[in-house]
Amino acid sequence: MDAAFTAEQDEIRRTLREILGRRCGPDEVKAAVRTAGGYDRELWQQLSRQLGLPGIAVAEDYGGVGCGPADLALACEETGRVLLPSPLLATAALCVPLITALGTGAQRSALLPSLASGGMTAALAVPGPALATALALTGGDAAGQWSGGGRAGGVQARADEAGGGWRLYGEAAQVLDGHSAELLLVAAHAGGFARSRTLLFLVREGAPGLVRSRQAVLDETRPQARVQLRDVPAELLGEQGAGGEGADVLAALAATGRTASAVLAAEAVGAAGEALARTVEYVRRREQFGRAIGSFQAVKHRLADVYVQVQAARSAAYYAAWDPDQGGLALAQALEALRTAAGEAIQLHGGIGFTWEHDAHLYFKRAASDELLFGPVHRLRAHAADRAGLFAPAAAAAAAPARPVSPAAAVAAPPPAHEKVAV
């Protein structure tokens, strides 16, 4: 494995850092989240035209740059540093891979060029707070119960016998950038109890019966929406077989979850590194008892511990960008590093770190919000351990039937003469 970045990757990171340094300062971030869309549309168009940011992982045949998830992860590390509010994650990391994997040739040709150019944004709508489950980040759900599972709730899909196509009814909450996206990918349950399955549908902006509202959230730089579908016409993503079965949506969602977790890990590492850098800069300038507080040994040790944790998380994130199968574990480590770095930033900034005007709380809110959306950390680690089979021998031994024990063997043998017996 060659861990060195290519010249093109270094250039993308350098250019992106320069643009964000000029256009995405703390004041610009706070102004962007207060707009109707929740992000700076002019900056989004600049990043799309100059760097092709939304199309980094889109094939060149569809107007993209033709790079892979690793390049998208490196770009998101830079956007995470400044907590850039943008539809990049929802569009490029969640929706583009699903359209590429499941869409028909006509659907890919119609949608991917617009998404790659930044002219269209997309959002993945999953019923309830089940995004981590749908993406198989915290455990699989072979039955797709999170989408409705034949019970009340979720989003239900029925075939429109009269006009063809499909109709959707239900509600999805915590949809990333769902209030501003021109295209929604809606996960819905179809087939009732007998032929239960989860399918993905395309819903256009302005479709009759579609009601979207922006939610009040903990992290304003990660806008979310509630999407209500009231008999909304929809188009099935992909083709439906003769038996009524669609593509393997759950497998495609799980594959998307693996690459998205690597991207999220890089983004969280970027935020953690910036929170640490700002804290180090502050303790060098802040004086107490006639000297900089950064010269105190206790402060040095705390920041050194954070530095080690952030660097370890960065290494894990880079490895996951190369091997997305390790994305869940890298995401757990990155979220933990961000939470620690943001918490120490607030503590070491002292009283000013608790104020609304300072930026420290934004990084802490990003840490808490991402863990609520994509975690929690202990479940990410548990699922990674299950996938690696770490506890398979123990589970097999526990499931094995007990062997009968003879009465003679049940009596404990006396200890050897040389062995001491504890009383």
Summary of predicted features, one role per range:
Residues M1-G80, G118, A255-V423:
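Alpha-helical interface subdomain recognition
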